[in-house]
Amino acid sequence: MARVMTAQIRQYTTPIDTSVPDSKRKYIPSSGTYPRGFRVSGTHVGVKPSNTTFPDLALISSDEPCSAAAVFTTNRFQAAPVQVSKQILEAREGRGIRGVVVNAGCANAVTGKGGLEDAKSMSAKVDECNGLNSTGGQGDSSTLVMSTGVIGQRLPIQKILSGIPTGYSNLSSTHAAWLKTARAICTTDTFPKLVSQTFTLPSSPDRTYHIAGMTKGAGMIHPNMATLLGIICTDAPIAPSALQSLLTHAVSRSFNSISIDGDTSTNDTVALLANGAAGGQPISSPTSPEYTAMQSILTGFAQSLAQLVVRDGEGATKFVTVRVQNSPSHSDAKLIASTIARSPLVKTALYGKDANWGRILCAAGYTQGLSPGTLVPERTSVSFKPVDGSAELKLVVNGEPEVVDEERAAAILQDEDLEIVVDLGGGNQGEAAKGGEDALYWFCDFSHEYVTINGDYRT
């Protein structure tokens, strides 16, 4: 039977409201609660010549200096803004950061010394707007830089430098401003990705803190850190010494636990800024209740942002969670989960609504780098967990195939959301390791549209 194709229209940058696919509108917040002392703006400067309307320059600014931390791409061809932002954070030891400037439409990657100078000039221009005299990229710079878009092209730097003062003059703390800023960092995304929430900490349960973040990404996503950008801001007081470890833990279990196409970009960056504007005692000790609480809050928040990236995967029709459980270690469970998430055969089977569990086991079986005895075939089980809360559909139990109700399997695969559970049964430790470590990974399927989008990307 012929498959009926419904194309999603992908623009260079996030389209106006009327172009957001109906299925994605529910992910765009109509309101938000934002951290004190942060203001943001999204401005059109026309980084890409074909963009004549949409905002493509984002500014995130704190009224007071922030503690800051970031996690960057592991790609050896690190883009100029990655190198410059690393340099700024190292020189300042995570202190005194005032904000972030982001352009969409050009990655400023593999652009040589000129690209580095462009990134530094973006940082210096924002500092100038803040009344600071900096050279960009040195110890006196206080603005981090991010870029996303096509690799190997120089920035239209004069357009950007001319647009920064306009963006600075339009800084605002309103929901509309945050949403427009989230739009400004997008490329092939079909919707802006913005999340905000309030929280409390054990030492001051009556004090309300805020956290807000935006992210972009729809393709070239298999972070360690892909083109994936994330900016998270909070008004909680967090010492620089604690901020990096908090972010690293959160990213490991969120942005580094998603995959769309298995590619890792030159530009990936997730930054966390904390200005302490809500008051209270700074979080500093990793053994304190405040640190433990903040770690849980930040990790859950980062997962919410990262999952939006998967939901907007290029050409995606499925949002899939793979849970590997009862593993002797978290790292081994994550290796297996990531291998399944990257498998083109698994992803295409899910697009075709085919309950082909053999592809899942095959991917698990060729996972590289596992500790000896982690994966024992006769202890391994696979099931589908429906989103409606009904009983799991068992596909394989302790290495033995189950008689599968194909009609129920087909019904489960009709839903957009699916959870695949791979139970290792404790590996060669058996019952002793049951109740052991779990890992979650989020990914999407591969469709015909993914090929179409990426075949046309530069145009």
Swiss-Prot record:
PTM section of the record: The alpha and beta chains are autoproteolytically processed from a single precursor protein within the mitochondrion.
Keywords recorded for this protein, A-Z: Acyltransferase, Amino-acid biosynthesis, Arginine biosynthesis, Autocatalytic cleavage, Mitochondrion, Multifunctional enzyme, Transferase
Subcellular location: Mitochondrion matrix
A GO CC term attached to the entry: mitochondrial matrix
Name of one Pfam family that matches: ArgJ
Principal cellular location given in the protein's record: mitochondrion
EC number: 2.3.1.35, 2.3.1.1
InterPro entries per UniProt: Arg_biosynth_ArgJ, ArgJ-like_dom_sf, ArgJ_beta_C
Record-marked site positions (Cleavage): A226, T227
GO biological process: L-arginine biosynthetic process; ornithine biosynthetic process
GO molecular function, one term: glutamate N-acetyltransferase activity
Site entry: Involved in the stabilization of negative charge on the oxyanion by the formation of the oxyanion hole: T148, G149
Amino acids binding substrate: T187, K216, T227, E314, N454, T459
Pathway(s) the chain acts in: Amino-acid biosynthesis; L-arginine biosynthesis; L-ornithine and N-acetyl-L-glutamate from L-glutamate and N(2)-acetyl-L-ornithine (cyclic): step 1/1; Amino-acid biosynthesis; L-arginine biosynthesis; N(2)-acetyl-L-ornithine from L-glutamate: step 1/4
Catalytic activity line of the entry: N(2)-acetyl-L-ornithine + L-glutamate = N-acetyl-L-glutamate + L-ornithine; L-glutamate + acetyl-CoA = N-acetyl-L-glutamate + CoA + H(+)
Top enzyme category: transferase
NCBIfam families per the UniProt record, alphabetical: ArgJ, PRK05388.1
Subunit structure: Heterodimer of an alpha and a beta chain.
HAMAP family hit by this protein: ArgJ
Note: This protein may be expected to contain an N-terminal transit peptide but none has been predicted.
Family: Belongs to the ArgJ family.
Function: Catalyzes two activities which are involved in the cyclic version of arginine biosynthesis: the synthesis of acetylglutamate from glutamate and acetyl-CoA, and of ornithine by transacetylation between acetylornithine and glutamate.
Cross-referenced PANTHER family: ARGININE BIOSYNTHESIS BIFUNCTIONAL PROTEIN ARGJ, ARGININE BIOSYNTHESIS BIFUNCTIONAL PROTEIN ARGJ, MITOCHONDRIAL
Protein name listed in UniProt: Arginine biosynthesis bifunctional protein ArgJ, mitochondrial
Source species: Uncinocarpus reesii (strain UAMH 1704)
